[in-house]
Amino acid sequence: NLEEDKLYEIESNIYETDDNGNVYKKNHTLLPEITYEKNTFDYTTDNRGRISSWNGKPQYMPENERDEIAQLEAGGEDRQEGDDGGHLVARILGGSSGNENIVPMRDTVNRGDYKKVENEIAQAVKQGKNVDDSGEIMYEGDETRPSKIKRVYEIDGEKSVLKVDNVKKSFDLMEDFEENIEKNDLENLLCEIDDMHEDGCDVSITSILKKYDQSGNLLSIRVGIRNETDGEKTYKTYDMKKAG
């Protein structure tokens, strides 16, 4: 058995072990189709060695340092201008610092839509609430840069589902909520987007956040909208459409 969280050099190759002493990296690259544990979180990789999911219980760890090199290198050739190296699980929540917990993420998503949820989770953990956190990362084709990230977290039994779109000028998330909000709310949102387009602005729907009660009933939906031309970001919260 190998020691946990160690580097081993064997025949000019460097191997790294996770919290259980299992090898999960070769020459600093994640191995394909494995499950590894770092800082109490379990992660999986797909057949190309890309992070595909995570789950665990966040802890409040404000003293954790970042790995700036891993953040700068995330995504390799598929990284785009304006990307951050975004932690899937924030360092302050016990997420590890290296590329085993980092993907290229639009800066507006990482510092806005995603950060808002991290702050909510951190506050709940600080207050001693029971928090579970999991997520899925989606990719287009062979790209190493995610197209979307879905995060599901429960705070004292109340579920929230965040979806972020990592693609500029995308409206893919519209189909995830257009059936859930009142018709006039949807029409007003579409009119607002049309007005921005008529003004010559590019627009993205960057995120949706669905909030549920303890019985699993959908209560509200928050939509993140970005004017890509002037950089203005707005968040709009809608109540669930009434039955009938």
PLM-predicted stretches and their roles:
Residues 1-28, 33:
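Long, low-complexity, intrinsically disordered regions
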Residues 26-243:
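Domain-level detector of nuclease and nuclease-like folds
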